């Protein structure tokens, strides 16, 4: 029964659409209908400004980090922890507050793995930032992160988390499917074009 509580808690917390709330409260816009129509930090930053994008990023990371860290204090069972982590990320992608729609889950995945495999996450974030800096495409950086995460999770010794990391890779590619299509057609928005 306690497992069910933790899964529901993680899913509920993951479902909270902080980006949507920030957009409505801070810049009076529905980010689901403007820009990339994503509720993530990138779209918040584009529409509302950098500081609000950072706020959305931190909150989305926290909703992955907090339930996993709390659950880890309850049990070190890797299956249990993986399920809690997955519930938080799935909550972000399929939010009960947005008719089972949501964001792309990069920030929430980062939060989950900062709690479980911080070194692997750090290295993966370095690749994410490097690709964004070089290419100008946040989506390309996110996809690079998705590929790097299982690799660094394995090589840094967090072997028990590799299946979860692989699952997150598949999910992140799925949530970025439209970005992948736009990248292939040369139609993806680049931060560099804004300068």
From Swiss-Prot:
Single GO MF descriptor: acyl-phosphate glycerol-3-phosphate acyltransferase activity
Location within or outside the cell: Cell inner membrane
The UniProt record lists the keyword Nucleotide-binding: no
Swiss-Prot/TrEMBL catalytic activity: an acyl phosphate + sn-glycerol 3-phosphate = a 1-acyl-sn-glycero-3-phosphate + phosphate
Membrane protein topology class: Multi-pass membrane protein
Segments traversing the membrane: 2-22, 52-72, 78-98, 112-132, 145-165
Keywords, comma-separated and alphabetical: Cell inner membrane, Cell membrane, Lipid biosynthesis, Lipid metabolism, Membrane, Phospholipid biosynthesis, Phospholipid metabolism, Transferase, Transmembrane, Transmembrane helix
Main localization of the protein described in the UniProt heading: membrane
UniProt feature coiled coil, ranges: none
Pathway participation: Lipid metabolism; phospholipid metabolism
GO BP term, pick one: phospholipid biosynthetic process
Top EC group: transferase
Any one of the GO CC terms: plasma membrane
One Pfam entry name: G3P_acyltransf
Annotated InterPro entries: G3P_acylTferase_PlsY
Protein EC: 2.3.1.275
Subunit structure: Probably interacts with PlsX.
Job description of the protein: Catalyzes the transfer of an acyl group from acyl-phosphate (acyl-PO(4)) to glycerol-3-phosphate (G3P) to form lysophosphatidic acid (LPA). This enzyme utilizes acyl-phosphate as fatty acyl donor, but not acyl-CoA or acyl-ACP.
Family: Belongs to the PlsY family.
Annotated protein name in UniProt: Glycerol-3-phosphate acyltransferase
Organism, scientific name: Maridesulfovibrio salexigens (strain ATCC 14822 / DSM 2638 / NCIMB 8403 / VKM B-1763)
Gene that this sequence comes from: plsY
